[in-house]
């Protein structure tokens, strides 16, 4: 049976003027004075927005993009990434390997993307891996 209203103790609430938005503090300063609670740092939201924007400016320097369109493209990239990673994981499991290599990624791209799009994606991916390999030597 729940306690009656008379039995409840009043909760210590923040003043009504306090907003729910986190206060702006210096990220480097963490103070734990007596009685003060530590502020939880805001979780970072990782997106592909900056990379999408850079590619847009390379292709169409005078064109902008709305926040909604950026959000849609970000969801699209996340979806394709997840599909390729899942397929590559399955391919590695079929071949009894515990490591996903560039070969599994390439095969999964060929399986997921249709026709000409897969060919272009594979060639761009191969070019990127070659460029990375030559720069690390």
UniProtKB/Swiss-Prot annotation:
<keyword id="KW-0238">DNA-binding</keyword>
<keyword id="KW-0158">Chromosome</keyword>
<feature type="modified residue" description="N6-acetyllysine; alternate">
    <location>
        <position position="8"/>
    </location>
</feature>
<dbReference type="InterPro" id="IPR007125">
    <property type="entry name" value="Histone_H2A/H2B/H3"/>
</dbReference>
<dbReference type="InterPro" id="IPR055333">
    <property type="entry name" value="HISTONE_H2B_site"/>
</dbReference>
<feature type="modified residue" description="N6-acetyllysine; alternate">
    <location>
        <position position="24"/>
    </location>
</feature>
<feature type="modified residue" description="N6-acetyllysine; alternate">
    <location>
        <position position="9"/>
    </location>
</feature>
<dbReference type="InterPro" id="IPR009072">
    <property type="entry name" value="Histone-fold"/>
</dbReference>
<keyword id="KW-1017">Isopeptide bond</keyword>
<keyword id="KW-0007">Acetylation</keyword>
<dbReference type="GO" id="GO:0003677">
    <property type="term" value="F:DNA binding"/>
</dbReference>
<feature type="cross-link" description="Glycyl lysine isopeptide (Lys-Gly) (interchain with G-Cter in SUMO); alternate">
    <location>
        <position position="8"/>
    </location>
</feature>
<comment type="function">
    <text>Core component of nucleosome. Nucleosomes wrap and compact DNA into chromatin, limiting DNA accessibility to the cellular machineries which require DNA as a template. Histones thereby play a central role in transcription regulation, DNA repair, DNA replication and chromosomal stability. DNA accessibility is regulated via a complex set of post-translational modifications of histones, also called histone code, and nucleosome remodeling.</text>
</comment>
<dbReference type="GO" id="GO:0000786">
    <property type="term" value="C:nucleosome"/>
</dbReference>
<keyword id="KW-0544">Nucleosome core</keyword>
<dbReference type="GO" id="GO:0005634">
    <property type="term" value="C:nucleus"/>
</dbReference>
<feature type="cross-link" description="Glycyl lysine isopeptide (Lys-Gly) (interchain with G-Cter in ubiquitin)">
    <location>
        <position position="131"/>
    </location>
</feature>
<dbReference type="InterPro" id="IPR000558">
    <property type="entry name" value="Histone_H2B"/>
</dbReference>
<comment type="subunit">
    <text>The nucleosome is a histone octamer containing two molecules each of H2A, H2B, H3 and H4 assembled in one H3-H4 heterotetramer and two H2A-H2B heterodimers. The octamer wraps approximately 147 bp of DNA.</text>
</comment>
<feature type="cross-link" description="Glycyl lysine isopeptide (Lys-Gly) (interchain with G-Cter in SUMO); alternate">
    <location>
        <position position="24"/>
    </location>
</feature>
<feature type="compositionally biased region" description="Basic and acidic residues">
    <location>
        <begin position="1"/>
        <end position="10"/>
    </location>
</feature>
<keyword id="KW-0539">Nucleus</keyword>
<feature type="region of interest" description="Disordered">
    <location>
        <begin position="1"/>
        <end position="45"/>
    </location>
</feature>
<feature type="cross-link" description="Glycyl lysine isopeptide (Lys-Gly) (interchain with G-Cter in SUMO)">
    <location>
        <position position="25"/>
    </location>
</feature>
<protein>
    <recommendedName>
        <fullName>Histone H2B</fullName>
    </recommendedName>
</protein>
<dbReference type="Pfam" id="PF00125">
    <property type="entry name" value="Histone"/>
</dbReference>
<dbReference type="GO" id="GO:0030527">
    <property type="term" value="F:structural constituent of chromatin"/>
</dbReference>
<feature type="cross-link" description="Glycyl lysine isopeptide (Lys-Gly) (interchain with G-Cter in SUMO); alternate">
    <location>
        <position position="9"/>
    </location>
</feature>
<dbReference type="GO" id="GO:0046982">
    <property type="term" value="F:protein heterodimerization activity"/>
</dbReference>
<keyword id="KW-0832">Ubl conjugation</keyword>
<comment type="similarity">
    <text>Belongs to the histone H2B family.</text>
</comment>
<feature type="modified residue" description="N6-acetyllysine">
    <location>
        <position position="13"/>
    </location>
</feature>
């Amino acid at each position: 049976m729940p306690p009656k209203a008379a039995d409840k103790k009043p909760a210590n609430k923040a003043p009504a003027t306090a907003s729910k938005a986190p206060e702006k503090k210096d990220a480097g300063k963490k103070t734990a004075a007596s009685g003060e609670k530590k502020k939880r740092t805001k979780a970072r939201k990782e997106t592909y927005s900056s990379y999408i924007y850079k590619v847009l400016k390379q292709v169409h320097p005078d064109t902008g993009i709305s926040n909604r369109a950026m959000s849609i493209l970000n969801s699209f990239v996340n979806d394709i990434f997840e599909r390729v990673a899942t397929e590559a994981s399955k391919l590695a499991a079929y071949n009894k390997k515990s490591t996903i290599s560039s070969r599994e990624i390439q095969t999964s791209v060929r399986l997921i993307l249709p026709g000409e799009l897969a060919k272009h994606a594979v060639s761009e991916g191969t070019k990127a891996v070659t460029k990375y390999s030559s720069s690390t030597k």
